[in-house]
From Swiss-Prot:
Homodimer. The lineage of its organism: Bacteria, Bacillati, Bacillota, Bacillota incertae sedis, Caldicellulosiruptorales. Its cofactor is Mg(2+). SUPFAM superfamilies: Nucleoside phosphorylase/phosphoribosyltransferase catalytic domain, Nucleoside phosphorylase/phosphoribosyltransferase N-terminal domain. It comes from Caldicellulosiruptor bescii (strain ATCC BAA-1888 / DSM 6725 / KCTC 15123 / Z-1320) (Anaerocellum thermophilum). 5-phospho-alpha-D-ribose 1-diphosphate binds at residues 80, 83-84, 88, 90-93, 108-116, 120. Binds 2 magnesium ions per monomer. It catalyses: N-(5-phospho-beta-D-ribosyl)anthranilate + diphosphate = 5-phospho-alpha-D-ribose 1-diphosphate + anthranilate. This is Anthranilate phosphoribosyltransferase. Mg(2+) 1 binds at S92, E225.
Amino acid sequence: MLIDVLELVTNKKDLEYDQVKNLLDNILEGELDEIKFGAFLAALKTKGETEKEISAFVDAFYDKAKKLNFDHPATIDTCGTGGDGKGTFNISTAAAIVLSCFDVKVAKHGNRSITSNSGSADILEKLGIDIQAEEDKILKGLEKLNFAFLFAPLYHPAMKKVANLRRSLGIRTVFNILGPLLNPVPLKYQVVGTFSFDAQDKVASVLRGNRKKAAVIHSLDGLDEISISQKTRVLEIQDKNIKEYYIDPKDYGIKFDTNSIRGFSPEENARILISVLEGEKSPYFWAVVLNCGFALYICEVAKDVEEGIKLSSKAIESKKAYLKLKELRQFYKSGV
């Protein structure tokens, strides 16, 4: 089966959903021919993955995932693809903590760093939060504190099968955009940052029709966040429609150089996050309130981004966000 599909893809033929899904199901149930599957991934990348092909990857790995039974009308994730190569501070993780101060349930899906200094798992671990909490703890945390971290390797054991191959290939493949599409919690809302405009288009096409409201973002200066330096392209998804527009930070009185929000070690990033939640008005602060403000708009807490920024700022300035972090550290103690 794999050789037949490989022949089609190397000739730049698009595949049907069932062709890819059946292939992946067989691979995940049986033996993996790394050479042929690696060639398939590389050929698929060269051809350009279609919505049907990506959806088949998502469904095949989601079928094998450990899922969490948590149904709520306002579940949201702010997990990005990572891999933008900019080495910025953990903006979406900090924004997720502020977001949990509101009446939404933040299911933060993430992993350790692969390309940056500090992934979401790394910084949360340094904050003393157990990134491998048991399921009952996760569900209780979502219910009581509006926040849980879902450490991707715990929920996607099937990914281990392709881990060595991905490392050996050393190039971006369809797997680099799957993470945000595989949250173990059923999401109503989502903000996904991507590493390129091409990835942005692909993720948006797959999300369409699968969330109540979502947005996929990539900035002109290459960030997988809403930028505080340049305009950010937004693909907003609602009712199966995709609307494109740009967010300019200057419209909200925010303008800083991208280098002003660079990230460091997990320890240093944890210190920066605490300083943000304590209300220190640094570029990091404005990056967090801008991104949280946008998320509040997407999950329909704020009527627009401007109101979202005001709400985010108030949550920090009132110490509500800092107290939330203290609650999370106490609840998800890791002993670090």
